[in-house]
Amino acid sequence: MIRKLTLALLLTLPTIGVAIDLEGFYITPKGGISKSMDTGVTVGDTGGGQFDIKDNDLGTGSVFGLSIGKYITNNFRLELEASQRGGLEYDTEYASEPNLGTTTKADIDTKSIFINGFYDFESFTISSTSVTPYFGGGVGISRNKMGTTTETTPDQVITDLDGNTLSQFSYKLAAGTLVSLTESLSLDINYQYVNLGNFKSGLDYVVVSGGAGSDTLTEALNGGEIKTQELMVGLQYKF
């Protein structure tokens, strides 16, 4: 999705430039490392029985995005950002009977759209290079996909549970620095905390090893919240 959006935006920029004045606008492709935080102790329900699932983080993944923004004043700017996170994995186990010791694994992927606002502080110079610190945040919507969930009991009975995708309210807080490279191009380095909302499994499952059968859960497996700390690097080009 991000690649298609990036290509579409780049192809339409010349046309947009003819139609409107691009002064004050900027574009920022970016990428970075996404380190997840604990999702929280959650409760599973399979056919009427509830049990605790151990607190778990989703490991470390990657994040890529593209922002298009506009300087409203010399210090305040707004932007629309599309981003995608991958490489995260739900990997935990049940912490209570009757499924004590059963492991649960699933790949996690998220796509999000944010509206961000940033305040740029006064610039200062280091070795003839202009540096501009900033802080801000954003709100948006994320599409959180939990892939096929594989559960393995201590007796090696393996069950696959359908994946699911949820739309969730998301928010972020960020602080960073713009390092001027040319009059129009700046290196954008920032740290951000992002809460992407909840993720859950589907309801249908099938036993794939150590037994036979299929059924439907009375309640989806609740994985908890996707919360990440991210270090991002981008290139801001001002028109």
Model regions and ranges:
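Short loop/turn motifs that connect adjacent beta-strands in outer-membrane beta-barrel proteins
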Residues: 19-24, 75, 123-131, 181-184
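Residue-level signature of outer-membrane beta-barrel architecture
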Residues: 20, 70, 82, 119-121, ...
